[in-house]
C-alpha cells in the first residue's frame, strides 16, 4: 500500500469510528476497553454493516469539500485585489461596474467559446457589470500562442475586437489561424508578433496559473463572481443570478 493509500485508509477508519459512536454501537464501559478491543469492535461493526464504509467516505468528502470552501473564501479575500484590479488584465463591459466577473479561459476550449456568447448576452442585458479576463492557456502550445497574440493586441487598442474574433472562430486555433484573424481585423501583424514576447504577457499567464491553482480550478471556463466560484460553463441566466447575489451582498 502506498503512503497516500495508507493515510486514506486511516482517515476512513477514523471516520468509521466516528460514525459508530454516532450510531451508538459502543458498549457500556467502552471507555475502559483497550485500543485493540475498540478496533475489534469497530471491525465487527463494519463487517456487519458494510454501508458504514460508504458513509465514512461520504463524510470524508464532505469534510474535504467544506475545508476547501473555507480555504477558497480566505483566498478570495486575500487575493481580491489581484483578481479584480490587476492592471495587467484586460477588461470588458462597464469599467466602473458595481459587480466584477473574473473569467478564466482558453481560446481552444470549445466550452469557452460557447461561454463567451453567454457572457456577451449578460453584458447586453446588464450594463453595470465589469469583466476581468484571465487568459489561462492550458490546452497546449497553440493556446499559449493565441493568448500571447491577444494580449499583445492591447498595445494596438484592439484587444476586445481580437478576443471576440478568436472566440468566434470555428475549430482549433493554430498560429496561422491566429495571425490570419489578426490581419483580418486590422492588426499590424509584424508589430503584434514582436509584442507577443513582452514580459507583461509572461506575467499575466503566470498570475493566471497561480490564481487558478489556488482556487482549485481544474479546467476552463471558470468564474469568480463576488464570493462565488463557478467552475465550468455558466448560462447567461445563471450568470445574472450570481451577479444579482453579489450585488445584493454589497
Briefly describe each language-model feature range:
Residues 41, 102, 107, 113-183, ...:
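Structural alpha/beta surface segment adjacent to cysteine/selenocysteine redox centers
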